[in-house]
Amino acid sequence: MPSKKYADYKGAEPYFELVRSALGDLVDGEHFFDVVADNIAYEVRYDLGWPRVIRGRDDLMAQFLGYVGNIRLRSADKLIANRADNSRVVVIEYEVHGTILATGAKYENRFCSIIELENRKIARWRDYMDSLAAWNALTAGAH
């Protein structure tokens, strides 16, 4: 259940819950933003509206506000999680399913994320996604 503290991010809650469950007892905190280090480096390896590297928890939260203003997720699933480097690194593969709010187009996407942990928080995140799936969803109705 989403915390009132993060109610504005409800549109991404399935993603947050999937990530939190993938990390289990490796991190401290209930919500995704609780387990993110204040000085996180969140890198996205695609160019669809986000900066290549987001630095800091506050900036990451601001980016997610933009995300939930454009996309509402209804689910996140097909999680595959692998741990490496004595569980200091977690690699997750997953899918998200939702709606592009401006057009009502279906949004289906696949991701692979490499998560580095320090002091029981997410210190670094490197994200890869199916850019074609995102492009098709975001431009639906424009072609």
Residue ranges and their predicted role:
Residues 30-90:
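A solvent-exposed, acidic/Ser-Thr-rich amphipathic alpha-helical stretch
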Residues 1-38, 142-143:
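Short, low-complexity N-terminal intrinsically disordered segments enriched in polar/charged residues
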Residues 14-24, 48-51, 68-72, 93-95:
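Short, mixed-charge, low-aromatic patches
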Residues 19-23, 36, 42, 54-56, ...:
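Broad hydrophobic/π-residue packing in well-ordered secondary structure
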